[in-house]
């Protein structure tokens, strides 16, 4: 078992003597770590036997251990719950991806899953681990424009109440300075907002992995609501409106999450005003060019022998289309 002095030195390594707030956090980390040494030993034992993450805390990212002592992920989470979430995430992750891929995700720069070939639409989607985003999840899907982040999801894999591997999204965040860029991109994406576009990519990611259940954090469940006194540091983003607009529904088995459909249904002729049909047709044709290489890039990361049945088949994923293909289905007569 690690000594008390080990945890004191660790607390100073993570926080350092930078200011009063950091000193306070160092003391809190130390006190909580020492009083929960058995849980920390469980954490260390798990990662010592997890090949792609061996030495991660000592050699690469000691700050990641802060997940143990701070109320992250969701409202009022306990250290036991956060440790279980960590173990579940990495256990599930290893069923999907090879050890080399996991090592690159957490020790390296991650993977580009799609880059636009259109110079007038310089977008890139990347799957990465950003230690600064560990408060809401253990992996991120980023959307970049000209190398600058526009939106990103922070998420983790976990078992739902039925014991099924699922995705839990802890936040969606946008650039504070990306409003003007968002307007430009929405036009270039034929009316598709970048926020909705990255959600679409996330849904395709889930489908490709064969995951059937996708959960999204609610306003009430966001981790910052664990703290009674936060002043103007409280979360100002309204998640619920966006999720509900995308078809999310409450789930009696999930206290802090909505269940979100894993599919985004294409609108049909009867659901689109006649003057906007050409816009939607162009948008769907664009998605038809984006999704197949995006799926191929995801599958290239799979562990050998992992060949899941997609949990849904998006229309853009179908590459064998007839010559008279219309991205908007003909109206029912």
Where does each model-flagged region fall?
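Non-catalytic substrate-recognition and accessory regions of acyl/acetyltransferase enzymes
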Residues: 1-184, 279-333
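Acyl-donor binding region in acyl/amide transferases
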Residues: 151, 160-250
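Generic preference for flexible, low-structure residues
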Residues: 157, 183-185, 210, 222, ...
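Hydrophobic transmembrane alpha-helix bundles
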Residues: 195, 249-262, 290-302
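Active-site/acyl-donor-binding loops of N-acyltransferases
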Residues: 220-286
């Amino acid at each position: 078992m690690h000594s008390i002095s080990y945890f004191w030195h660790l607390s100073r390594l993570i926080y350092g003597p930078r200011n009063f707030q950091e000193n306070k956090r160092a003391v809190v980390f130390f006190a909580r770590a020492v009083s929960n040494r058995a849980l920390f030993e469980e954490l260390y034992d798990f990662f010592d036997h997890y090949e792609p993450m061996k030495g991660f805390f000592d050699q690469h990212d000691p700050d990641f251990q802060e997940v143990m002592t701070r109320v992250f992920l969701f409202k009022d989470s306990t250290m036991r719950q956060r440790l279980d979430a960590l173990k579940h995430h990495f256990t599930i992750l290893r069923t999907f991806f090879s050890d080399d891929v996991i090592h690159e995700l957490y020790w390296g720069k991650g993977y580009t899953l799609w880059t636009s070939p259109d110079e007038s639409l310089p977008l890139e989607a990347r799957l990465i681990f950003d230690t600064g985003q560990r408060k809401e999840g253990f992996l991120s899907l980023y959307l970049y424009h000209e190398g600058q982040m526009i939106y990103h999801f922070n998420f983790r894999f976990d078992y739902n109440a039925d014991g099924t591997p699922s995705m839990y999204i802890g936040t969606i965040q946008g650039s504070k300075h990306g409003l003007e860029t968002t307007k430009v991109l929405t036009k270039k994406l034929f009316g598709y907002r970048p926020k909705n576009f990255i959600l679409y990519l996330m849904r395709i990611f889930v489908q490709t992995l064969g995951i059937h259940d996708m959960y999204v954090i609610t306003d009430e469940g966001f981790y910052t609501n664990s703290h009674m006194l936060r002043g103007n540091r409280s979360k100002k983003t309204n998640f619920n409106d966006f999720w509900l607009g995308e078809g999310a529904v409450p789930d009696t088995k999930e206290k802090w999450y909505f269940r979100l459909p894993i599919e985004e249904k294409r609108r049909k002729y009867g659901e689109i005003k006649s003057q906007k049909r050409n816009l939607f047709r162009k948008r769907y044709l664009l998605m038809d060019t984006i999704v197949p290489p995006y799926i191929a890039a995801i599958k290239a990361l799979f562990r050998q022998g992992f060949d899941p049945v997609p949990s849904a088949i998006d229309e853009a994923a179908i590459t064998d289309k007839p010559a008279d293909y219309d991205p908007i289905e003909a109206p029912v007569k």
